[in-house]
Amino acid sequence: MKVNPNNIELIISAVKEDQYPETELSEVALSGRSNVGKSTFINSMIGRKNMARTSQQPGKTQTLNFYNIDEQLIFVDVPGYGYAKVSKTQREKFGKMIEEYITKRENLQLVIQLVDLRHDPTQDDILMYNYLKHFDIPTLVICTKEDKIPKGKVQKHIKNIKTQLDMDPDDTIVSYSSIQNNKQQQIWNLIEPYIS
């Protein structure tokens, strides 16, 4: 699958169902804890530096951001979870917004769950993965920040994450580095069956 990086736009930032875009395109949602690198991942996948706004401040994305990717699919950037400085009320609001999207949106075909390859999955990562499995949502786990791990230890870290998430054998896990930028095609190939 090839995408034209010049044909990508943020369609809408939504907080509730009646704001979701009316479209026939399949949607791929990106979930992960705050600061796992969702925006950086989107930018590197589409070959654009600042399409999805990256921030040094975790918990910055507070809406569901719908990006039309070359009229082929829509990436939905979901607010990061597990950020301590977001108030309890705000966290509950995010939770409801994410739940409404994941359980009601028929266009949703796949969730890419991003986890940090350097660390064990957090309790929130495990809860999110189990939540997706509970609703039978196809899930692709991407382990970010691969460049921060010595090459010889990458497989060990992947195996650890797979075990701790108690991953469904049908789900795929891939390590990724937005800096090395060498696995986009592999990931597009994994996404493609869900959107065609």
From Swiss-Prot:
Mg(2+) binds at residues 39, 61. One of its GO terms (molecular function) is GTP binding. Coiled coil: none annotated. GO terms for biological process: division septum assembly. Signal peptide: none annotated. Residues 24-196 form the EngB-type G domain. Belongs to the TRAFAC class TrmE-Era-EngA-EngB-Septin-like GTPase superfamily. EngB GTPase family. Pfam families: MMR_HSR1. Necessary for normal cell division and for the maintenance of normal septation. The keyword Endoplasmic reticulum does not apply. The keyword Nucleotide-binding applies. Its cofactor is Mg(2+). This is Probable GTP-binding protein EngB. InterPro entries: G_ENGB_dom (IPR030393), GTP-bd (IPR006073), GTP-bd_ribosome_bio_YsxC (IPR019987), P-loop_NTPase (IPR027417). Gene3D superfamilies: P-loop containing nucleotide triphosphate hydrolases (3.40.50.300). GTP binds at residues 32-39, 59-63, 77-80, 144-147, 176-178. Keywords: Cell cycle, Cell division, GTP-binding, Magnesium, Metal-binding, Nucleotide-binding, Septation. GO terms for cellular component: cytosol. The gene is engB.
